[in-house]
Structure formats: C-alpha cells, structure tokens
C-alpha cells in the first residue's frame, strides 16, 4: 500500500494531479479542498494517499491532511458510497463541516452537495454518526475554525491580502458555513 508521496507537482487538472516522484508520475484524484490548497505546478509537495485496487484498475487518492484521508475512508465504508462520491462530499464540505453536519443531523447541508440525494444523505447521517468526531478529534467548535480557515484561504487565493481577509473575517458570524462566509466576506470587501 502507498501511504504517502513526496515529489514535484507536475500537473494540476481538477480533480486530478500528477505528482512526479523521482521520475515516476503518479496520477492522483484529490478533493477540491486539497486541490485549491496545493502549491503551483513545479513546486514540491507531500500528500497522504489512499490506494484502491478495483477490477477496472488501480487508483490513488491524495489528501493534504490525515483528517481528510480518514474522513474519505469512513465515507467509503458507507453503503452505496464510492470513491467519486466520497471525493464530492469532501469537495463540498470541509472535514469539520462534515463532522458538524453529521453530529447535528443536518440533512440539508449534505443534500446541497452535487451527487448527494435525500436517501444518500440520510444514509450518510446514519452510518457516520459518531465515527468522524470521535476518531478525528473534531468537535463542533473546531468545525467553525475549519470553516473560517477555508474562508480565509479562499480570500487569499482570490488576491486579497491578509489584513483585508482578517478584517472581513471579524465581521462574520461565528457559526457561518464556508460557502456563506465566502459570499458574505466578498460582499464586505467589495464595499471597501
């Protein structure tokens, strides 16, 4: 099993990347949360991986954090959830937001994710209950911190400086979701 890869980021084509490790290019599928936090092509990076062998091929999935990889593996254990759907869930919600949605049984947050219908969302809530928060150490309060960090990262990626991002972050409610927070922060920054 391949648990980690360190190398030069050769290509970035969402949701896939190619990581050049000593002349061997490993193609990995990554959630968009990982994709947007990767350095530019040509830079060195380290990814934790999940290696899957199926009858149609061998697949590598990459993650920047252990929490993301753990959540991905927990999602794969849910009946009817494959790797593509698990990546979609992690692309739509941070690990903290997912843990909070499961802990608070927020069906609506899961249904907003592309490819997740009501029945699948209900199954996710049922089968993941207690598994994400306990094993990852994610509580409801760090979920807010994850969301705020994602909002800040998005603002920095859009070209705002740290001072502008911090100023906008102070004006956001404590329990804001990532997507709502980004929208609200952009509105606040456009008024300046």
Curated annotation (Swiss-Prot):
Biological role: The RuvA-RuvB-RuvC complex processes Holliday junction (HJ) DNA during genetic recombination and DNA repair, while the RuvA-RuvB complex plays an important role in the rescue of blocked DNA replication forks via replication fork reversal (RFR). RuvA specifically binds to HJ cruciform DNA, conferring on it an open structure. The RuvB hexamer acts as an ATP-dependent pump, pulling dsDNA into and through the RuvAB complex. HJ branch migration allows RuvC to scan DNA until it finds its consensus sequence, where it cleaves and resolves the cruciform DNA.
Keyword Transferase among record annotations: no
Any one Gene Ontology cellular component term annotated for this protein: Holliday junction resolvase complex
Compartments where found: Cytoplasm
Main localization, broad class: cytoplasm
UniProt region (Domain III), positions on chain: 149-192
InterPro entries, per database record: DNA_helicase_Holl-junc_RuvA_I (IPR013849), Hlx-hairpin-Hlx_DNA-bd_motif (IPR003583), NA-bd_OB-fold (IPR012340), RuvA (IPR000085), RuvA_2-like (IPR010994), RuvA_C (IPR011114), RuvA_C_sf (IPR036267)
Flexible linker as annotated region, ranges: 144-149
CDD domains associated with the record: UBA_RuvA_C
HAMAP family, A to Z: DNA_HJ_migration_RuvA
Keyword Transmembrane: no
GO BP term, example: DNA recombination
Name of the encoding gene: ruvA
Protein family per UniProt: Belongs to the RuvA family.
Self-association state and partner proteins as the record states: Homotetramer. Forms an RuvA(8)-RuvB(12)-Holliday junction (HJ) complex. HJ DNA is sandwiched between 2 RuvA tetramers; dsDNA enters through RuvA and exits via RuvB. An RuvB hexamer assembles on each DNA strand where it exits the tetramer. Each RuvB hexamer is contacted by two RuvA subunits (via domain III) on 2 adjacent RuvB subunits; this complex drives branch migration. In the full resolvosome a probable DNA-RuvA(4)-RuvB(12)-RuvC(2) complex forms which resolves the HJ.
Region (Domain II): 65-143
The protein's name in its UniProt record: Holliday junction branch migration complex subunit RuvA
Molecular function in Gene Ontology: ATP binding; four-way junction DNA binding; four-way junction helicase activity
Keywords: Cytoplasm, DNA damage, DNA recombination, DNA repair, DNA-binding
Residues in the signal sequence: none
Domain remarks: Has three domains with a flexible linker between the domains II and III and assumes an 'L' shape. Domain III is highly mobile and contacts RuvB.
Region (Domain I): 1-64
Organism: Dechloromonas aromatica (strain RCB)
Sequence intervals crossing the membrane: none
Gene3D superfamilies xref list: 5' to 3' exonuclease, C-terminal subdomain (1.10.150.20), DNA helicase RuvA subunit, C-terminal domain (1.10.8.10), Nucleic acid-binding proteins (2.40.50.140)
């Amino acid at each position: 099993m391949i648990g980690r890869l360190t190398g030069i980021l050769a290509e970035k084509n969402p949701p896939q990347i190619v990581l050049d490790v000593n002349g061997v290019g490993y193609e990995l599928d990554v959630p968009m949360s990982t994709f947007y936090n990767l350095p530019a092509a040509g830079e060195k990076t380290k990814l934790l991986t999940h290696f899957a062998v199926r009858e149609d091929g061998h697949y590598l999935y990459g993650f920047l954090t252990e929490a993301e990889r753990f959540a991905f593996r927990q999602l794969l254990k849910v009946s009817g959830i494959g790797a593509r759907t698990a990546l979609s869930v992690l692309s739509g919600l941070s690990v903290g937001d997912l843990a909070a949605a499961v802990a608070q049984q927020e069906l609506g947050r899961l249904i907003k994710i592309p490819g997740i219908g009501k029945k699948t969302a209900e199954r996710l809530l049922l089968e993941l209950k207690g598994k994400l928060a306990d094993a990852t150490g994610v509580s409801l309060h760090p979920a807010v911190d994850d969301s705020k960090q994602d909002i800040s990262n998005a603002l920095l990626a859009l070209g705002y400086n740290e001072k502008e991002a911090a100023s906008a972050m102070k004006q956001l409610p404590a329990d804001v979701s990532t997507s709502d927070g980004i929208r609200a922060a952009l509105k606040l920054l456009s008024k300046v």
